[in-house]
């Protein structure tokens, strides 16, 4: 039996079904999502918290938590440059796959990123494909928050799009239909990020078997 994978790719993610009925919720958008980290060296994570995915939120007390097996690491966020932006310097102490969660400090509006590989200094892991990178960006850029169960944004489950149209839309979002509940914010995506998201959204990765 086939089922759509946008609901199962991201274990531990707080789905918007709760948030959309909780009164106040935020979308976390990571600025530059790293492909990997170097164990023992600080990696900078910055993000913007937007209330209802639109308005930047100021004066939050956020933090970042990372887990790999029995190992844990954490960092306190500080205000960054620009409205609603926060920065944290996180050090992953040992090589391995680390699950990183950004606690926004705005209610339960947190996001758990897909695992990040920490490698030994001097080691370069295999480069991510556009589809792999796009899958990570779909979470890290906050797309999954609004689209994963179609409660807020359109359900993208199993759909395919013209690549040129989709790339143009991601670069300059606009309201698709007058009945849409809200307009997608412009996330300032880089061309490489747009290409990766287009590759992921149009891939077979969205479909898996039980």
Question: What spans do the regions from the language model cover?
Answer:
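Beta-strand-rich structural segments
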Residues: 28, 40-55, 88
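Short amphipathic beta-strand segments in non-cytosolic proteins
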Residues: 51, 62-77
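Edge beta-strands of extracellular beta-sandwich domains
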Residues: 109-118
């Amino acid at each position: 039996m086939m089922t759509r994978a946008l609901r199962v790719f991201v274990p531990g993610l707080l789905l918007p079904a709760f948030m959309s009925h909780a009164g106040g919720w935020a979308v976390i958008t990571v600025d530059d999502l790293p492909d990997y980290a170097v164990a023992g060296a600080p990696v900078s994570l910055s993000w913007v918290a937007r209330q209802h995915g639109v308005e930047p939120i100021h004066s939050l007390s956020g933090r970042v938590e990372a887990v790999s097996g029995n190992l844990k690491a954490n960092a306190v966020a500080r205000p960054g440059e620009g409205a609603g932006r926060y920065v944290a310097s996180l050090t992953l102490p040992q090589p391995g796959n680390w699950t990183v969660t950004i606690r926004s400090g705005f209610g339960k509006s947190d996001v758990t990123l897909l695992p990040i590989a920490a490698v030994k200094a001097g080691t370069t892991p295999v480069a991510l494909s556009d589809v792999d990178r796009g899958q990570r960006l779909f979470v890290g850029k906050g797309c999954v928050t609004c689209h994963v169960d179609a409660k807020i944004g359109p359900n993208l489950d199993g759909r395919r799009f013209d690549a040129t149209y989709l790339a143009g839309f991601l670069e300059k979002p606009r309201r698709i239909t007058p009945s849409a509940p809200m307009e997608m914010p412009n996330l300032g995506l880089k061309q490489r990020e747009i290409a990766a998201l287009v590759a992921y959204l149009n891939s077979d990765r969205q479909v898996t078997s039980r």
